[in-house]
Amino acid sequence: MARTTTLGRGGLLTWLGVALIVIVLDQLTKTLILGHFQYGDARHVTGFFNIVRVHNTGAAFSFLAGASGWQRWFFVGLGLVAAGFIVWMLRSQGHQRLFAWALSLILGGAIGNVIDRLLHGYVVDFLDVHWAGWHFPAFNIADSAITVGAALLILDELRRVRRG
């Protein structure tokens, strides 16, 4: 049986490489935002999209953002536990391509946001989608990767159920 740590198709290192690409893109874009925007700045891009700089001390949709500070370490711990579980899953399920893509995107996004929490105490969000005065909560590349990964997990499960 082939080792799952090889660079071959479906090997653990392949999927960790995908996660690393997400982490690098996420951190690069956040570094650019931190270097060129002040907190609260916004730049109009289109009629439905802005680049902003906001800090999220909570989770998705700023859940628990108003808590007293304990949530920083809670989400760091949760992210690290999730990362460990995902790596374990990739070691055994890396041959299932869609599933592994999904997990790799989620892994990269989770680690990207954990890095922010460790470095800054908050997650840097900067993508602002809006329509007719309604703004979706700002998000970042890591959040996008997690969302796409979750959608791929659902798709993978639907395909698995359909196959019987």
Swiss-Prot record:
Give the principal location in a single coarse category.
membrane
**GO MF term set:** aspartic-type endopeptidase activity
The name under which this protein is listed is Lipoprotein signal peptidase
Localization = Cell inner membrane
Pathway(s) it belongs to? Protein modification; lipoprotein biosynthesis (signal peptide cleavage)
What class does this enzyme belong to in the EC scheme?
A: hydrolase
Give the active-site positions: D125, D143
- Family note: Belongs to the peptidase A8 family.
Q: What is its EC number?
A: 3.4.23.36
Q: Which PANTHER family match?
A: LIPOPROTEIN SIGNAL PEPTIDASE (PTHR33695:SF1)
What catalytic activity is recorded? Release of signal peptides from bacterial membrane prolipoproteins. Hydrolyzes -Xaa-Yaa-Zaa-|-(S,diacylglyceryl)Cys-, in which Xaa is hydrophobic (preferably Leu), and Yaa (Ala or Ser) and Zaa (Gly or Ala) have small, neutral side chains
Q: Where are the transmembrane segments?
A: 5-25, 70-90, 98-118, 135-155
Q: Which UniProt keywords apply?
A: Aspartyl protease, Cell inner membrane, Cell membrane, Hydrolase, Membrane, Protease, Transmembrane, Transmembrane helix
Cellular component terms, GO, for this chain's entry? Answer: plasma membrane
